[in-house]
């Protein structure tokens, strides 16, 4: 992205024209004071001269636009100073495949942590790289840790993630594969089973302004949703609005220090057991899904669903009046009728009352179809016929009469009748 600078190259700006000061001095103002018609004529002449001068300066004024390219990303460390150091001995057996020690005490791994050699500075280190020309590029892991020696020649992005940087849920913003479950120490890449935006920050030096210190250091890596600090235990929970920013902040603040010389322990946070937090997370996911659906649908359709389309309101008021002036049907009746029309496939049908009255029972179907309604009573003749059909439509069925004896005689082999 290029920066734009505007330079005024008009002749008036380049060379100052000599001007005559016609403003009267203080002494002259006391002696000569225009009044009445003389004052009006003098004011009109000054206004006319000013308008002519502004018109001439507008015609001669030109602008020259200079486009400056974005600055390239700078190398964070000198490549000549890079050297591979063996890891500190924390166990009894060295694994050459994983370059780790094993067999040591489990609690020693937190006490033997070494401070990070460098820290990323977004304002100074960020810039364009080769990855900016490739769509879908991942972010540089070594840039987040502050030890990338390649600078603008790096194949990964050297900047902060934004809301427009979307990746598959099975990888993080650095392109590393996620797992189905978290590690026992809640470290590493994380899990793809749920979207985690909260970091656990431990081993913080306890002070009175610990919340302000944590918010100031972690706000550098993205927009923070909320921060919860346990002052007595030196523990903080930082929640970002974007998951990619949480992944970037986890790698950027690992083994770093705040205002003191502590070594932070940054891990993924477990699920918050607070019911209010779970409801808040569920509501956020619903809003995110609704926003995704809203972006996928046309703007006119979304406006009609949300009741912000004036044409839809006007059409509803006209077509849904059912022939009654001033009547506006409720939403339930409107959507039920619309769903019925969609099921029949009649797109041009309007929401009007049916021509034939609907019968309540099947017994009323025997009434004549073209009855003339009488206007002498309260109810119409069709309504009276429908009410009569309620009583006459009930049909009772009698059971078949049972035979009193066998239908045919039968013979017996026994002769003792």
UniProtKB/Swiss-Prot annotation:
Gene Ontology BP annotations: mRNA cis splicing, via spliceosome; positive regulation of cell cycle; positive regulation of RNA splicing; spliceosomal snRNP assembly
Superkingdom in the source lineage: Eukaryota
Chief site of localization: nucleus
Chain positions of all zinc fingers (C3H1-type): 134-161
Keyword RNA-binding: yes
Cellular component GO terms, alphabetical: post-mRNA release spliceosomal complex; Prp19 complex; U2-type catalytic step 1 spliceosome; U2-type catalytic step 2 spliceosome
Region (Disordered): 1-89, 391-417
UniProt keywords, alphabetically: Cell cycle, Metal-binding, mRNA processing, mRNA splicing, Nucleus, RNA-binding, Spliceosome, Zinc, Zinc-finger
Biased composition (Basic residues): 60-73
Transmembrane regions listed in the UniProt entry: none
Annotated Polar residues bias: 40-57
Record GO terms (molecular function): pre-mRNA binding; U6 snRNA binding; zinc ion binding
RRM domain sequence ranges: 197-271
Subcellular location: Nucleus
Keyword Transferase assigned: no
PANTHER family: PRE-MRNA-SPLICING FACTOR CWC2, PRE-MRNA-SPLICING FACTOR RBM22
Function: Involved in the first step of pre-mRNA splicing. Required for cell growth and cell cycle control. Plays a role in the levels of the U1, U4, U5 and U6 snRNAs and the maintenance of the U4/U6 snRNA complex. May provide the link between the 'nineteen complex' NTC spliceosome protein complex and the spliceosome through the U6 snRNA. Associates predominantly with U6 snRNAs in assembled active spliceosomes. Binds directly to the internal stem-loop (ISL) domain of the U6 snRNA and to the pre-mRNA intron near the 5' splice site during the activation and catalytic phases of the spliceosome cycle.
Comment on protein domains: The C-terminal RRM domain and the zinc finger motif are necessary for RNA-binding.
Complex and partners: Associated with the spliceosome.
Record family assignment: Belongs to the RRM CWC2 family.
Protein name: Pre-mRNA-splicing factor cwc2
């Amino acid at each position: 992205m290029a920066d734009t600078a505007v330079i005024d190259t008009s002749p008036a700006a380049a060379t100052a024209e000599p001007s005559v000061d016609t403003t009267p001095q203080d002494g002259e103002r006391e002696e000569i004071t225009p009044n009445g018609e003389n004052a009006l004529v003098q004011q009109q002449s000054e206004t006319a001269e000013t308008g002519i001068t502004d018109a001439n300066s507008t015609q001669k004024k030109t602008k020259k636009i200079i486009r400056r390219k974005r600055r390239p990303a700078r190398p964070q460390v000198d490549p000549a100073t890079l050297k591979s150091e063996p890891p500190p001995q924390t166990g009894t057996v060295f694994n050459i495949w994983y370059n780790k020690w094993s067999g040591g005490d489990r609690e020693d791994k937190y006490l033997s942590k070494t401070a990070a050699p460098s820290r990323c500075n977004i304002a100074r280190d960020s810039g364009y790289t080769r990855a900016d020309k490739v769509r879908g590029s991942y972010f540089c892991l070594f840039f987040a840790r502050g030890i990338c020696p390649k600078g603008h020649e790096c194949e990964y992005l050297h900047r902060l993630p934004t809301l427009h940087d979307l990746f598959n849920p099975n990888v993080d913003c650095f392109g590393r594969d996620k797992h189905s479950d978290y590690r026992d120490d809640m470290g590493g890449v994380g899990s793809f089973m749920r979207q985690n935006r909260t970091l656990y920050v431990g081993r913080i030096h306890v002070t009175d302004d610990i919340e302000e210190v944590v918010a100031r250091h972690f706000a550098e890596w993205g927009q923070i949703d909320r921060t919860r600090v346990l002052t007595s235990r030196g523990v903080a929970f930082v929640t970002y609005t974007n998951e990619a920013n949480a992944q970037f902040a986890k790698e950027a603040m690992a083994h770093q220090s705040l205002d003191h010389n502590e070594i932070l322990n940054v891990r993924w946070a477990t699920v918050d057991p607070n019911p209010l937090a779970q409801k808040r997370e569920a509501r956020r996911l619903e809003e995110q899904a609704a926003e995704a659906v809203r972006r996928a649908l046309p703007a006119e359709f979304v406006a009609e669903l949300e009741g912000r389309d004036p044409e839809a309101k006007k059409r509803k008021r006209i077509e849904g009046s059912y022939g009654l002036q001033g009547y506006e049907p409720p939403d339930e009746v409107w959507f039920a009728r619309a769903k019925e029309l969609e099921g029949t496939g009649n797109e041009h049908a309007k929401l009007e009352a049916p021509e034939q009255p609907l019968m309540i029972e099947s017994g009323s179907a025997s009434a004549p179809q073209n009855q003339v309604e009488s206007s002498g009573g309260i109810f119409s003749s069709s309504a009276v016929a429908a009410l009569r059909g309620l009583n006459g439509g009930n049909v009772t069925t009698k059971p078949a009469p049972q035979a009193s004896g066998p239908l045919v005689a039968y013979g017996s082999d026994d002769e003792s009748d």
